[in-house]
Amino acid sequence: MPSQVIPEKQKAIVFYETDGKLEYKDVTVPEPKPNEILVHVKYSGVCHSDLHAWHGDWPFQLKFPLIGGHEGAGVVVKLGSNVKGWKVGDFAGIKWLNGTCMSCEYCEVGNESQCPYLDGTGFTHDGTFQEYATADAVQAAHIPPNVNLAEVAPILCAGITVYKALKRANVIPGQWVTISGACGGLGSLAIQYALAMGYRVIGIDGGNAKRKLFEQLGGEIFIDFTEEKDIVGAIIKATNGGSHGVINVSVSEAAIEASTRYCRPNGTVVLVGMPAHAYCNSDVFNQVVKSISIVGSCVGNRADTREALDFFARGLIKSPIHLAGLSDVPEIFAKMEKGEIVGRYVVETSK
């Protein structure tokens, strides 16, 4: 496929300091390094991590000025001089994990998210809230052809992340998984991956809109935290002993603590959501006697990415998205802060 004309300037959302003004402005289109591809980003998901990057309330080093976003889906328009395995015209995904060294002890065994030289999209590397963005060719995701780019965008972070978390829960088909924070961007995908993997799903969230989405996605038991006064007791009763696995994607410290009490003996609590400055409090006696495992799960590796995208490409996962324009990012952040989003926002970079 012949190379398309690449403009010198493009639209982007830029901020110059933590909590600084989110400016929708013209910036220069980046030039890919020898190891990078340049992607014409058609769509980008908006993740809660983007909000944390803007606030600067996670202990990550940030570059400034910074273009956020890390769920970019688009088309390859240019290759760096050393790039192999890609061609102009390929569908490509830009993940949070933009690049790693591929030679440290963590990269060698597929734990790239622990690489000490990790380059994070939307944190240390300008992200996908722009029309053209670069990504390391090794870590960029190969998106299958004929996939809807708007709908696949959230898979590139939210989908991969919850898929990896479900694998870490060590649950077998027919057992119970509880999704805490079930109907946000991550939770709505976690429900579907869990069902596709053969698990029975309980969802915890608040409000009728989220109950409706949970039921539409095929979940079995919904617990509304605004109505249920004894969430721990309700889950233990419904599952006849507790949930075999728990995926915590909520940003509530209290919800994390509760999950350690309704987890079944020998079960696994997986921490995914990262509320700023929060702690995981677990009663030691309860944890020891019940032999509960509490594990953290960050983003997935390249194999997890391929597997998560395969579920999507086969039609097993649907993205409950709301489309907006790139210029709407400030308003989306405001809704996110208020907990008003059901599903996932995806922005079209040309608007």
UniProtKB/Swiss-Prot annotation:
Crosslinked positions (Glycyl lysine isopeptide (Lys-Gly) (interchain with G-Cter in ubiquitin)): K229, K237, K290
Name the UniProt key words of this record, in alphabetical order. Answer: Cytoplasm, Isopeptide bond, Metal-binding, NAD, Oxidoreductase, Phosphoprotein, Ubl conjugation, Zinc
- Say which enzyme class the record assigns: oxidoreductase
Q: Which reaction does it catalyse?
A: a primary alcohol + NAD(+) = an aldehyde + NADH + H(+); a secondary alcohol + NAD(+) = a ketone + NADH + H(+)
Write down the EC number.
1.1.1.1
The residues listed in the UniProt record as binding Zn(2+) 1, with positions renumbered to this chain, are C47, H70, E71, C157
Cofactor names: Zn(2+)
Q: Name one GO cellular component term.
A: cytoplasm
Q: Which residues bind NAD(+)?
A: H48, S49, H52, G184, G185, L186, D205, K210, F225, V272, M274, S297, V299, R344
Give the signal peptide, or none: none
Q: Does the keyword Glycosyltransferase apply?
A: no
Q: In which broad location class does this protein mainly occur, judging by the first location in its UniProt entry?
A: cytoplasm
The miscellaneous remark of the record is: Present with 1310 molecules/cell in log phase SD medium.
Entry function: Can reduces acetaldehyde to ethanol. The role of ADH5 in yeast metabolism is not yet known, but ADH5 is not responsible for the production of ethanol during growth on glucose nor responsible for the oxidation of ethanol to acetaldehyde.
What name does the UniProt record give this protein?
Answer: Alcohol dehydrogenase 5
**What organism does the UniProt record list as the source?**
Saccharomyces cerevisiae (strain ATCC 204508 / S288c)
Q: Which gene encodes it?
A: ADH5
